Amino acid sequence: MYGDLANKLILEAKRTQQLNQRRVNEDLQSGGGVNLLSRLPIYHDELVRNILNEVDQLRRNAEFLRNNGNAEEFAHLDEKIVKCQYFVTLLCMERNKRCLLAYQKLRTDILDNIAWCNNGTGIELYSGSNEDETNSLSHYEQEYLKEYGELITELKSESMADIDLSGSLEPPSDVFIDVRVLKDAGEIQTEYGVFNLIKDSQFFVRQSDVERLIQQGYLQKI
């Protein structure tokens, strides 16, 4: 039945949205920052293509009804019935388009967050060493994430180099915080000295100095 494929796509988008929100809440509760990696399930390329084919079929049906509504083969039908068929066909076609746009918009929003939270290096951090993560993106999504990250990097390296555009919009509740190192990150230079971030060690540091490391999963706020 027309519309069933689009309904499957929307259900998949809703599951992705709910899963993302649950992971965000878990990340915030753990104090380790919001980890945006490995967020997206695999892109349903075949399902999207089938919906596009269905839209094309509906378009041809609508054109046929519009151009042949008064033909002899429809003479035995009431004019209102033909118009109703035409209208319902258009509704099905538009609904499929809206479902496709909603699916793409959700995935694009997540890709935008990945790029911003990783200072424009989203594609490198997203792919990492795990090929499954890269394979979850379509070819066009990989290109989009790469080029969007390049735009962010270019923007931050020019007139706004002194402003942390990717920083949190919420003011910190504490200037200094206790953090635990979740994985080795080497030495970092701050205004208050050098810290050697070794796994399982703890430090009392200024939050603004380590906020990026918290978001990237190197540190956890205690």
From Swiss-Prot:
CDD domains assigned: GINS_A_psf1, GINS_B_Psf1
Pfam families listed in its UniProt record: PSF1_C (PF24997), Sld5 (PF05916)
Keyword set includes Nucleus: yes
Origin: domain of life: Eukaryota
Gene3D superfamilies cross-referenced by the UniProt entry: 1.20.58.1030
Entry keywords, A to Z: DNA replication, Nucleus
Subcellular localization(s) per the UniProt record: Nucleus
CC terms in the record's Gene Ontology section: CMG complex; GINS complex; nuclear replication fork
One Gene Ontology term from the biological process aspect of the record: double-strand break repair via break-induced replication
InterPro entries named among the record's database cross-references: GINS_A, GINS_bundle-like_dom_sf, GINS_Psf1, PSF1_C
Annotated TM spans: none
Function of the protein: The GINS complex plays an essential role in the initiation of DNA replication.
Known partners and oligomeric status: Component of the GINS complex which is a heterotetramer of SLD5, PSF1, PSF2 and PSF3.
Family, per entry: Belongs to the GINS1/PSF1 family.
Protein name (record): DNA replication complex GINS protein PSF1
Organism: Candida glabrata (strain ATCC 2001 / BCRC 20586 / JCM 3761 / NBRC 0622 / NRRL Y-65 / CBS 138) (Yeast)
